[in-house]
Amino acid sequence: MDFAIPTEIQNYLAELDAFIAREIVPLESEHRQYFDHRREHARTNWDDDGKPRREWEDLLAEMRRRADRAGHLRFALPRELGGRDGSNLAMAIIREHLAHKGLGLHNDLQNESSIVGNFPQVHLMHRFGTPAQKARFLDAMITGEEAVAFGLTEPDHGSDATWLETTAVRDGS
């Protein structure tokens, strides 16, 4: 088995690095308080039940806009959603590459934001959503205008998805 990183993925990593240097590092430098020892306080509105501060959310939105405009945010999504049909292998390598760069606006795993979006909920909506749901939510989920949550925990297994006992049966279309 060949464990070498495919050339096209290596080239894409170089493209990402150039984008980060050109677009993200300057933006992050203007907002250091969100990435150093002050980050929890800077990101959190303690007077509003600990919700994220609007300024932090706005910075994440700007990062997503820039990444989307450059063609990175939707990398793993199907072409019909503006993506590049990125593979699981490519995503694993990209995520590892970005994480290795450390804490930053390019990839903040604390709140699952990244210049290369990880969108399992978008894939699910694209595959199983009704036309009305897709029209309302798909693009908004990608851009961060809408958030989606799902329940994973069960009484006997917590959040270990490998032990889920809940099942579903398709009933209708």
Residues covered by each model-derived region:
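Amphipathic, small/basic residue-rich leader segments at the start of a protein or domain
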Residues: M1-E112, A132-T143
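Short alpha-helix boundary/capping motifs
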Residues: D48, V122-H123, T153
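Short beta-strands and strand-loop turn motifs
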Residues: F75-L77, I115-N118, A149
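Glycine-rich, Trp-frequent "lid" loop and neighboring beta-strands that shape
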Residues: G83-R84, F128-S173
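N-terminal glycine-rich flavin-associated loop
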Residues: L109-A132, G158
